[in-house]
Amino acid sequence: MALVFELMPNGSLENWLHESRNMSVGQRLDVGIDIALALDYLHNGCEPPIVHCDLKPSNVLLDEDMVAHVGDFGLAKVMFDISGEQSTTGQSSSYAVKGSIGYIPPEYGMGSKISPLGDVYSFGILLLEMITGMRPTNNLFTDGIGIHEYVMNLLPDNASDIIDSTSLRSDGTTDEKLECIVSMLEIGVACSVKILVKE
């Protein structure tokens, strides 16, 4: 048996955010929407629901039209309850939690069960990284201050100080673009709030 995948000639989002390539504000917005739609499908369109568990820039692939596709489902979990039936609580019976540092919810390290909320958290961190250009593992983030707290403390008044300058250079800054960027940052902050998923 062989698996055949669609060619993704534009590589991963990681390459566009942290190498020599530049993404415009519009492209970043489109990619964010594509990822949100993919997560909505996994969490609400699949039967049973699937939690990706490893959403990060290197697992987002871009096709020839710069449409984002979520890939690498090696850590994904199907949401079943202990009896083997689909979970109605949105929690899984699995305690084996893996993922990428900086993107995985801190609650998973405290024994919380896997939940779609974990993917929402990872999506929020990913949005913040897309707009700031800073990895969540940046050395700037110490003493309990992560990318979430960093952005939250600067919004909305100092948003222009935290925006990745390459996105603004590629297509210029306007009030409309800045408003769009601030909205994306606010969504990223809202999604990456630490929420304990109860047992």
Language model features with spans:
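Residue immediately N-terminal to the catalytic "proton-acceptor" Asp
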Residues: 48, 53, 68
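Cytosolic eukaryotic protein kinase-like domains
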Residues: 1-33, 66, 70-199
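Protein kinase catalytic-loop region centered on the HRD/HxD motif
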Residues: 37-50
